[in-house]
């Protein structure tokens, strides 16, 4: 309960204060240490389900759930936005996180025309579905 209150307060204090300056990670579903056999590390191939929205308005701009297929990428090599490389690192399969990503770690001043406005801070609810270790 305290964690949910913390996320709520953090989320709304960020909106009231304006733009984010740092990546903020909230744990939605934690995996017990004894059940976490593999953590996602840079160089690993990962599969992630997600829903992305604009922090300011809450408008959802993309979701792998609606397509029925998670996104697959190599972690930590710049194939996704920096906020994802940083926010997914250390996750266990089945873990869920809420990533509040400042525009500087997302699409920056250019945004994504017609989808994400310039300098937009983003929120991603992510779930790590699979990890293939690089080692």
UniProtKB/Swiss-Prot annotation:
Top-level enzyme category: isomerase
A Pfam family hit: FKBP_C
Major location category of this protein: endoplasmic reticulum
EC numbers, comma separated: 5.2.1.8
Domain of life of the native organism: Eukaryota
Places the protein is found: Endoplasmic reticulum membrane
Keywords: Endoplasmic reticulum, Isomerase, Membrane, Rotamase, Signal
Biological process per Gene Ontology, one example term: chaperone-mediated protein folding
Signal peptide from the UniProt entry: 1-17
PPIase FKBP-type domain: residues covered: 43-132
Activity regulation summary: Inhibited by both FK506 and rapamycin. Binds FK506 with 15-fold lower affinity than FKB1.
GO cellular component: cytoplasm; endoplasmic reticulum; endoplasmic reticulum membrane; fungal-type vacuole; membrane; nucleus
Membrane topology type: Peripheral membrane protein
Catalytic activity: [protein]-peptidylproline (omega=180) = [protein]-peptidylproline (omega=0)
Physiological role: PPIases accelerate the folding of proteins. It catalyzes the cis-trans isomerization of proline imidic peptide bonds in oligopeptides. FKBP-13 may play a role in protein trafficking in the ER.
Sequence similarity: Belongs to the FKBP-type PPIase family. FKBP2 subfamily.
Other noteworthy facts: Present with 5400 molecules/cell in log phase SD medium.
The protein's name in its UniProt record: Peptidyl-prolyl cis-trans isomerase FPR2
Gene giving rise to this polypeptide: FPR2
């Amino acid at each position: 309960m305290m964690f949910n209150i913390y996320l709520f307060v953090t989320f709304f204090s960020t909106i009231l204060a304006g733009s984010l300056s740092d990546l903020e990670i909230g744990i939605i579903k934690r995996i017990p240490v004894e059940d976490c056999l593999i953590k996602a590390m840079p160089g690993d191939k990962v599969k992630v389900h997600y829903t992305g929205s604009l922090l300011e308005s809450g408008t959802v701009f993309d979701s792998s759930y609606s397509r029925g297929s998670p996104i697959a990428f190599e972690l930590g090599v710049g194939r996704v936005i920096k906020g994802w490389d940083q926010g997914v690192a250390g996750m266990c399969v089945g873990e869920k996180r809420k990533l509040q990503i400042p525009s500087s770690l997302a699409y920056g001043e250019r945004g994504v025309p017609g989808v994400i406005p310039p300098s937009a801070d983003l929120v991603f609810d992510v779930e790590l579905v699979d990890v293939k270790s690089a080692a």
